C-alpha cells in the first residue's frame, strides 16, 4: 500500500513498540501550545485513541518574576516554546489525530523524499531517545525557580529601600541567579557602583 500526500508516512514506525509508547516532539504554532494540548486531549477521547495517544505535556520550569514595584509573582515558563511532547504508540490513526489537530505544524523527525512528482516529502516522526526524555523531565522536576526581572543594562532605576533610598542611577550589571544588580549611583558627586537586591529598586520610565 502506498500513501498519498494527505495520508500517514508512519508505516515504518509500526514495528515493535513498547506498551508505554514513545515520546515524540510536535511543532505547533507559536503561543498555541496550551490550546493544542487541550484540543488534542479532547480529540483523543472523541476519536477513541486513548489507548495509543497516552500523554500530552508542555514541559515548564518555575519562575519568579520581579515586578516594577518589587513584588514577587510566581509563575511558569515553557522550556521549549513552540513544541508539545506526546507519548504515544505510533500508528496511522494516531498520527492523523495529532497531525490534524488545529495549530499543529508537524512532528519533529526526518524528512523523506517523495518517490515521484514535485514538492516536499513527508516527515517521518522520530521518537525521542530515553536519555533525552530523562533529561527533559529531570530538568522539570529538579529545576529551582528562575528569577526574572523587567530590568536590563542601561535602565534607569530608583532605590526604594536601604541606605541609598531615593538615589537614582543606571543599571550596569544584572545577576538573575543571585537576584541582584549593580547600578551607578551618584554618591558625593561621584558615580559609584552599588550592588542592590532586585526588590530594592524600581525601574523609571
From Swiss-Prot:
Keywords, in A-Z order: Transcription, Transcription antitermination, Transcription regulation, Transcription termination
Keyword Transmembrane found: no
UniProt-listed PROSITE patterns: NUSG
Keyword Transcription applies: yes
Domain KOW, first and last residues per copy: 154-178
Pfam families: KOW, NusG
SUPFAM superfamilies assigned: N-utilization substance G protein NusG, N-terminal domain, Translation proteins SH3-like domain
GO CC field: cytosol
UniProt xrefs under InterPro entries: KOW (IPR005824), NGN (IPR047050), NGN-like_dom (IPR006645), NGN_dom_sf (IPR036735), NusG-like (IPR043425), Rib_uL2_dom2 (IPR014722), Transcrpt_antiterm_NusG (IPR001062), Transcrpt_antiterm_NusG_bac_CS (IPR015869)
Cysteine disulfide links: none
Superkingdom classification of source: Bacteria
One BP annotation, GO: DNA-templated transcription termination
Function as written in the Swiss-Prot or TrEMBL entry: Participates in transcription elongation, termination and antitermination.
Family: Belongs to the NusG family.
The protein's name: Transcription termination/antitermination protein NusG
Native source species: Synechocystis sp. (strain ATCC 27184 / PCC 6803 / Kazusa)
Gene this protein is translated from: nusG
Amino acid at each position: 500500500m502506498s500513501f498519498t500526500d494527505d495520508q500517514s508516512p508512519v508505516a515504518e514506525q509500526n514495528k515493535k513498540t513498547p506498551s508505554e509508547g514513545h515520546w515524540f516532539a510536535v511543532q505547533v504554532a507559536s503561543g498555541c501550545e496550551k490550546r493544542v494540548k487541550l484540543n488534542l486531549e479532547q480529540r483523543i477521547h472523541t476519536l477513541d485513541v486513548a489507548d495509543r495517544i497516552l500523554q500530552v505535556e508542555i514541559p515548564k520550569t518555575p519562575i519568579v518574576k520581579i515586578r516594577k514595584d518589587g513584588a514577587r509573582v510566581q509563575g511558569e515558563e515553557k522550556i521549549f516554546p513552540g513544541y508539545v511532547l506526546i507519548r504515544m504508540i505510533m500508528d496511522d490513526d494516531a498520527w492523523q489525530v495529532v497531525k490534524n489537530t488545529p495549530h499543529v505544524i508537524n512532528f519533529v523527525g526526518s524528512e523523506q523524499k517523495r518517490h515521484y512528482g514535485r514538492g516536499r516529502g513527508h516527515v517521518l516522526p522520530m521518537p525521542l531517545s530515553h536519555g533525552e526524555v530523562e533529561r527533559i523531565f529531570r530538568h522539570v522536576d529538579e529545576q529551582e525557580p528562575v528569577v526574572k526581572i523587567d530590568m536590563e543594562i542601561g535602565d534607569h532605576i530608583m532605590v526604594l529601600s536601604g541606605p541609598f533610598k531615593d538615589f537614582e542611577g543606571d543599571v550596569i550589571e544584572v545577576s538573575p541567579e543571585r537576584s541582584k544588580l549593580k547600578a551607578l549611583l551618584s554618591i558625593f558627586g561621584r558615580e559609584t557602583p552599588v550592588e542592590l537586591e532586585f526588590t530594592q529598586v524600581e525601574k523609571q520610565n
